[in-house]
Amino acid sequence: MRRIDPNKLELEERVVAVNRVAKVVKGGRRFRFAALVVVGDKNGHVGFGTGKAQEVPDAIRKAIEDAKKNLITVPIVGTTIPHEVIGHFGAGEIILKPASEGTGVIAGGPARAVLELAGISDILSKSIGSNTPINMVRATIDGLKQLKRAEEVAKLRGKTVEELLG
């Protein structure tokens, strides 16, 4: 899979979660901040990243840099996705279903951020299992990676799109 150059895209960033984490040392606890950020151009490109630092702004900056390295392309048909898909990550699972125009993004918290920044404006989703932000974001990204356009499937099967769709 070719890497997507983030400099050619107008990316929008959204901080999904900031978490205070602690390392216990002899003299007490050392606190740091972990940030989870989703970036996307609202036109079929989306990515997520995590960053950890002593201060919140530094953690967010690191997460944004990481997210720009992990961009994926999402096939969009009109305002929705081409077909139903289930994304998995750890104990987190998300069902993504195409929706008719005007439905809007029906998704909870972290998944909503990913879907909106990918440029999908009509979709139904249901999260099952683990609902931690990182698991939900990774499961959503996994689901979006599985999506294929009708042309791609037809080419893989050696058929025409008309034969495929009946």
Swiss-Prot record:
GO CC term (a single one): small ribosomal subunit
Protein name per its UniProtKB record: Small ribosomal subunit protein uS5
PROSITE patterns per UniProt: RIBOSOMAL_S5, S5_DSRBD
Record-stated family: Belongs to the universal ribosomal protein uS5 family.
Organism: Anoxybacillus flavithermus (strain DSM 21510 / WK1)
Segments forming domain S5 DRBM: 11-74
HAMAP family in the record: Ribosomal_uS5_B (MF_01307_B)
Domain notes: The N-terminal domain interacts with the head of the 30S subunit; the C-terminal domain interacts with the body and contacts protein S4. The interaction surface between S4 and S5 is involved in control of translational fidelity.
Keyword Secreted: no
Example of a GO biological process term: translation
UniProt KW keywords: Ribonucleoprotein, Ribosomal protein, RNA-binding, rRNA-binding
